[in-house]
Amino acid sequence: MSVLKTDYVDDVINKELAADRKFGEVQNEDGTKSYNDVTPYTQEGDEYGAEQINFENKHTNYAIEAADRTYEGRDLTVEFAEEIAGFSDPWRWIKTRLAAHNIDGLHVEDYIPIYMGNYLIKMQIAGINTYTRCCDQEVGWHIDWISKDCYPDTVQWFTSNDNNGTSADPYPYNKSTVKSFLAGLEAKLPAEVRAVISSKRFLLEQRYSASGKLNDSTSWGWQDLGKLWIPCEYEVFGSLIWATKPWGEGQAVQYPIFANSWKNRIKGAGDGGSRANWWLLSVCAGHSTYACIVYGNGGASSYSCSDALWVPVCFRITE
């Protein structure tokens, strides 16, 4: 992001000619005369015009709105239409920007609209380099995108109403119906999106015992969430509320898009739809049949795994 300039300068008189001011005489129609200063002037410092000043002012306006939590995000395909025109599609432009470590003008809550079948999905920037240098496999420059509203169709967290893992795979999320559902949605993404997204690496909670169903998670391990995923409870709320401490946290951090405001935690059932209850990947502490959710009013809660709720569309693009 640009650092706002503080060295703007006005036109000044050439120092060598400062003592030799020159004026031109102009005869006016009413018989009077006017005198124009024709002394040579030069620019000292950078030549900053309206284009550059307006660009910097956008950064200033963003900083004010972001601090006040009033920023609504911009459609990047409109804001950067001229720049994007040099690429095959907006997502290739994003990928190229990341490869060049150039995120100038990109902000949390800015979005790019896509269609998944007939469904309009507005993909918002949830965080920029939120996990850079993190994880067992070091993460480089990246942007994580989370849809402004949920995908219109609902899904059960797990059809068997069970939040435990298995002997072969102790991670509850890996066996979940919701993960399989998201994997199926990948084919509905535009081809240009599928071409640039990467799997998200995550320190995922484990919950399994051969002696019987567990009510709490007992460990964690690094796993690939897939190319489409949903956030954990900590990534939304910045703390563990219903998930098991500390295993439900992993190495998570709250996404900037969810910080200090309910605004982006509240999602519609489809673009602009009514408030939706939506699934998180975390399973609930103290129960063997509940998973964590974001309630329609933005609060943290938990629902039975066999309930059918909504999910946002989430993906990562790396450098």
Task: Give each language-model segment a name.
Residues M1-E65:
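Extracellular "spike/adhesin" assembly and maturation modules
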Residues R69-E319:
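Collagenous Gly-X-Y triple-helix signature in extracellular proteins
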